[in-house]
């Protein structure tokens, strides 16, 4: 299975040290164990987790900008945890309103010594960290417009939203920021369509 992860990372054109890949794989095993009791993800097999969670998350790595990243609605840690593993020089904040999910994330961060992550249990609309983020990521949480409206107070001027979607979100993009760019994500081993909506924050 670790070879499947390595091949996928190579196909994405990414450079991730083998020790980090091993930690990512161990994180999936940890998630699988917790999932038996807490139902954190509908995907239960490691093989599918590699594709649907790890590689899917890592597919947006080339688009990541800045040093302060906020992952909204992190759930079981995607895309935030894989990105934090891959970018130890950046600081990630993972926010989710559900206690069982943030409890898992706190345990995972401690167990795997992911020192560049901060876990927050709170609704993102109420979150006031006292500073702006450079990039806000989000996967499977609301429409593009909803995500932008809920997090607008957290993104610095000139920063970016990276919103992960399945099929091309044509309807969602109507009436949103004209600077939106949609990238096709080719996730190794994943047959389903994946897209990334990149929107620059033009507020002055």
From Swiss-Prot:
The keyword Manganese does not apply. It comes from the Bacteria. Disulfide bonds: none annotated. GO terms for molecular function: rRNA (guanine-N7-)-methyltransferase activity. Its EC number is 2.1.1.170. S-adenosyl-L-methionine binds at residues 73, 78, 139. Keywords: Cytoplasm, Methyltransferase, rRNA processing, S-adenosyl-L-methionine, Transferase. It catalyses: guanosine(527) in 16S rRNA + S-adenosyl-L-methionine = N(7)-methylguanosine(527) in 16S rRNA + S-adenosyl-L-homocysteine. Its main location: cytoplasm. It is found in: Cytoplasm. Gene3D superfamilies: Vaccinia Virus protein VP39. InterPro entries: rRNA_ssu_MeTfrase_G (IPR003682), SAM-dependent_MTases_sf (IPR029063). GO terms for cellular component: cytosol. Specifically methylates the N7 position of guanine in position 527 of 16S rRNA. Belongs to the methyltransferase superfamily. RNA methyltransferase RsmG family. This is Ribosomal RNA small subunit methyltransferase G. It comes from Coxiella burnetii (strain Dugway 5J108-111).
